[in-house]
């Protein structure tokens, strides 16, 4: 599993911005899979999902993929969309990688 912290600039509500961009069709490669107690998104091509935890501070996301050797594809797609669509709203992206046992 991969965990991410996305720090916004100037109080940007990144969770709402991501949901809006997906629902408006600006981000076509992802779809909202659930909106209950937070939300999660799925990539239309790559396996796995990204689960968001609602916090007042940074955006917290966990990338979950049953096939750990394919996690990088989901990570690459997500970080790429963040950098492309929200570069003016994001101060930093921190990525934590869990060890494989």
Give the ranges of each region predicted by the language model.
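A general secondary-structure signal for short beta-strands and their flanking turns/coil
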Residues: 1, 56-58, 75
